[in-house]
Amino acid sequence: MKLRRAAVAAGLAVAAVAAHAQFVAVNEGFENVAGLPAAGWVLNNASTPIGTTGWFQAGPGFFDAFAGSQFSYIAANFNNAAAGGTIANFLFTPVFTTEGGSTVSFWARSIGEEGFVDHIRVGRTTGGTSAGDFIQIGGDITLTDTWTHYTFGIAKQPVGATGRAVIEYFGVADTSDFVGVDSLTVNVVPEPETWALFGLGLAALGFVKRRRKPA
């Protein structure tokens, strides 16, 4: 009886917490940009005309990372597009559930060299990885020469929905310079089924213990 009461109490506690709990679906420090595709990331440079670079691992000659080892951040620059071109370079996270809503946060900055300006915007997709799939959230961001923290939310989507978070580096190639993105996380509200299964597990535990009691 005591165990059953404990299981019921735990189940009620789970129900109370569920509405506010979030789990980390993506946690990327960009120590190894080359390994991102294998982890579900998509790097899509849709600049026109396309240039000689895309998203790449930072290296010597630029600013240090916000966190982690010295160059553990992902970078992009004016060479994403050819001279006179337009930059549209997309960074898509792995797919995660959007049913319960989610929060995406990261740090970003530019060099801040006089005469140049760097812009990014953030958004989501329903899973696609092309420029046409991009759904912008919030306004355009003009980066500064200081690591700055950005957070944006993805509203609750229909039952079973999944999607990706997106960062787009954009602008005129001739007046753009260099950007870095570091420490990106996606926190999601778990699907109701996750909590239901946990509650069933507690109930099953109480049932098994009750059946094991001696006659």
Model feature map: region roles:
Residues M1-V8:
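Bacterial N-terminal signal peptides that target proteins for export
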